[in-house]
Regions:
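Long, contiguous bundles of hydrophobic transmembrane helices that form the permeation core
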Residues: 175-220
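Hydrophobic alpha-helical transmembrane segments
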Residues: 7-8, 57, 95-97, 174
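Alpha-helical transmembrane segments
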Residues: 54-64, 171-187
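Transmembrane helix-loop junctions at the membrane interface of multipass transporters and ion channels
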Residues: 157-170
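Hydrophobic transmembrane alpha-helices of multi-pass solute/ion transporters
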Residues: 1-65, 82
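Membrane-embedded alpha-helical segments of transport systems
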Residues: 105, 137-159, 175-191
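Hydrophobic transmembrane alpha-helices that form the pore/transport pathway of multi-pass ion
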Residues: 80-148
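Interfacial loop-to-helix junctions that mark the boundaries of transmembrane helices
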Residues: 47-55, 170-176, 213-218
Length: 220
């Protein structure tokens, strides 16, 4: 996928590690033997098999798998429909739908990319249709989906690494992130509301909105 670029970068780093002490100036470092470099890369917690990789293989994989099960089961579309039914009628409702849908989906997926792909395919065209410009629509969706990484209970990979480095239960990190996550999405909500007011946008028409009761019945 990456091609030879990564191979070249690794080769340059190895060459620099072995012969970098011969360089004069600020780029110079103390002399390292090849055996020391190999030992440091493969047998210490700061090398390739480090704490972040261990956490990823042990804990993050399980939560990602759980989130994918929910997405495949239709939870993603359910959250989108629920957001449209709840927020679509308000001023600038399309953008607010994107925010709410991304925040809810963020509770089961800590991946900003997966969040964007799942919700953006629906919310970005909807925002453009209701009067938002394309670049603004994409920005709202990207920022909303990125916030899913700090939305408990399933956050981004960094949250698991933080818990591992600090030696505290993951739940403490998740609880500490509740207030920042709420403030993050509230600020984003007010931003799109002010933009909608300035542009004179209105909510979606009643016939375009799904009924809340129908959405809940279908989802459960």
């Amino acid at each position: 996928v990456i091609g030879n670029t990564l191979v070249v970068i690794i080769f340059i780093c190895l060459v620099y590690g072995i012969w970098g002490h011969l360089i004069e100036g600020s780029l110079s470092h103390r002399e390292f033997t090849l055996m020391w470099i190999i030992d440091h890369l493969f047998y210490t917690v700061t090398g390739i098999f480090s704490t972040p990789l261990g956490v990823s293989a042990t804990f993050i994989f399980l939560f990602i798998l759980f989130g994918k099960f929910l997405e495949v089961s239709g939870a993603g579309q359910f959250f989108i429909d629920l957001s449209v039914a709840g927020m679509g009628k308000y001023r600038g409702g399309a953008a607010k739908t994107a925010i709410v849908a991304s925040s809810i989906l963020g509770t089961i997926s800590g991946s900003a990319v997966a969040n964007t792909v799942t919700t953006g395919a629906f919310t970005i065209p909807l925002m453009k249709k209701t009067g938002y410009k394309g670049h603004f629509s994409a920005a709202v969706e990207a920022v909303s989906s990125t916030g899913g990484q700090i939305m408990p209970p399933i956050m981004g990979a960094s949250a698991f690494i933080i818990a591992s480095y600090l030696g505290v239960p993951y739940m403490e990190v998740a609880v500490a992130a509740i207030l920042p996550a709420i403030l993050y999405y509230c600020c984003l909500y007010f931003q799109v509301d002010m933009r909608a007011r300035r542009l004179g946008l209105v909510g979606l028409k009643k016939e375009e909105l799904p009924k809340m009761s129908s959405v809940l019945k279908k989802g459960f």
